[in-house]
């Protein structure tokens, strides 16, 4: 391949530009042999496609909560509960993952199934206003804290087409350091994950309200200054939630299921938990869990979620406690960023897999979040059980026998 002048690199997504990029790169076959027309609006300089194999694991036996937001505060309210059996799609190339998740789901099903809960729903854009002095930054913070209701009304009354009516401002929190006033705009975004709509609305607030109405004139407005928890783990949102859905999953495994399905014992699982928790603390790990990102990334890839959000979404806190007749296992995902409308969920492949779980479209995002949490706990249970065997032989054998199969 001969390098092409960067200025001459075709950047459009029309047929001619796509073919020009493919020809210049010498690409053909599998990566270019599919119809790319559904993806022309998905990204810039579209050139080909990457196919990821998808397994379907299940059924997961889950008691799911039914939820809605109250108004005007946007608190998550449980309106009912129902049990369902769900098949979960996993897009990945990690040998052993699907089999392990299935084993965890089976152990849970034989013990009464999973139970899941949604505690909170927020997504944040953390702007920053750079002032001349600390005094001005404090004045600005006091002004913003006193005008939350006015800002909500101002945003709701805007009629510009680019401002979203679905991204609703719920809270405003300020953090002053030096001459900077960081402002955390907290939104709910309906069934969309919502990063684009809340970014537009945060920009409108910054430039149309704060810069125009504040008693001090900031020198600079920055739309995102890294306090928002976007696409990276952070202690703030691990501990308190607030960037994504805060979701819990639990199951009480019987001694029989642990012994017969997981091939280990409660004692061995608790020994692993003790050692693993100390290891997590010693390493400074943000999460207290085993392998949550594997399940979350696989579901995200199958269902058109933003893969950049796996980092935040896979922050996890797992627990295990001996109870009469078995062990109680719990998992908290404080920042699960998912959507069932918009973005990549509109692609045919994503729609198909979301529909398989009855999670496509409006009114489905809390169901989807709970299914992700249950599937993640299923993998945590099985992977932990394999590591808890003597010498972690089961974990070794799974990777030796299944992890190396690529052809």
Roles of regions detected by a PLM:
Residues 1-87, 100-102, 120, 398-407:
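Acidic/polar, glycine-rich intrinsically disordered N-terminal extensions of enzymes
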Residues 188-346:
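Glycine-rich anion/phosphate-binding loop at the beta-strand->alpha-helix junction
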Residues 8, 361-407:
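Extended hydrophobic packing segments that form well-structured cores
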Residues 43, 57-61, 89, 126-132, ...:
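Short glycine-rich or small-residue beta-strand-to-loop segments that form or flank ligand, phosphate
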Residues 136, 150-183, 199-203, 207, ...:
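N-terminal loops that bind phosphate or other acidic moieties
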